[in-house]
Amino acid sequence: MEGREMKITDLKFEKIKIKLKKPFVISRGATEYCESVLVKITTDEGYYGFGEATPSRSVTGESIDSVTFVLKTFKEILIGQDPLAIERIHYILNKAIAGNTAAKAAVDIALYDIKGKVMQEPLYKLLGGFENKVQTDITIGIGAPQEMANEAKEMVARGFNILKIKTGIDLKNDVEAIRLIRKSVGDNVRLKIDANQGWNVHDTLTAIKMMENYNVEAVEQPLADWDFDGSALLRKKADMKIILDESIHNAHDAIHAMKKDSADMINIKLMKSGGLYEAEKIDAIAESAGINCMVGCMVETKVALTAGASLVAAKRNITDADLDSFMYYEEFEGIKGGFEVKGDTIILSDKPGLGIEINM
């Protein structure tokens, strides 16, 4: 006799918009709000899970409106499905609608939250359980060089030991910012830069040469997302690690990067990958090729951040994290639990699933 399958009975969602403390500027534009769609999936056995979609027009090709439209379609598809059959659900959703990875991530995260509650285990243990805490960097957005240096110094005083500096608009400004930041924070703080596709090969090599005295350990996505050959060339010519972010959305992209020798590290984001299910595949491919991963974020709430931090904590091969968007806005009172922060360390809850509660 076959066991009875649990069934999804409802999917509801709500849009949220949280004003940032100040605009967050990168080479591709500025952001003034954390805009997300929170999702709740409920089942006929009383279990429920929360998820989040934080779309990006320039990265995932989605907007808040497109996410809500797609989630309405997903609701029709998901009613009656077994929430623990995560691979089957991804297959069904991918057949129904291509892309739309932030919307899929919201569903995926909620399903893993349910699975953790059913198994009575926190998500980080469900995914691998390597440890329960994560050291994150803090990102400094583009601005006047001295202002960036002042912000960097403030973040180090708050306990952050790894800084990721946004670059890619003006090379002279970028180099001056790095010079002033290194001067203000001293030699013991790790520095990375992120151009968000703002440079070409020549610009990148020039920037690396000009920054050689400031102990910058890595440059993230300096080139266009399609330029795997250019990234491979940089790895040969530059004395700095090359991290791929926008180039890597899924496992197929990861395989392509490995074949091209394009990356020293891959930045996984749940909104690009469609959630944890595909993110685990990306990490497994990278690990098999001897390449470490990191997990980054959009400007997300605690829901997606907890999912991302759980993945980092779970996997030995994921050595770095850029899960800092909780620093950009005042704490959103509607989301409780998930993790606490001490200095630059995210300490995950031991409650089942995400360990989060939302009144929705």
Task: Enumerate the predicted regions with their spans.
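Structured beta-strand/loop patches that form or line metal/cofactor-binding pockets in enzymes
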Residues: G3-E45, F50, T54-R57, E330-F332
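Conserved, mostly hydrophobic/aromatic
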Residues: I8, V39, G46, V107, ...
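Metal- or metallocofactor-binding catalytic centers and their adjacent structured scaffolds
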Residues: D10, T42-V118
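Hydrophobic faces of well-ordered beta-strands that scaffold small-molecule active sites
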Residues: G49-G51, V134-I140, L163-I165, V189-A195, ...
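Glycine-rich phosphate/pyrophosphate-binding beta-alpha loops
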Residues: A53-G61, T139-G143, C297
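Shared catalytic-loop signature of beta/alpha-barrel
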Residues: F69, N215, W226-I243, I248-G343
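Metal-dependent enolase-superfamily TIM-barrel catalytic cores that perform enediolate-based chemistry
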Residues: K125-A238
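Structural signal for terminal/edge beta-strands and the immediately following C-terminal loop/tail
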Residues: K281, E340-M360
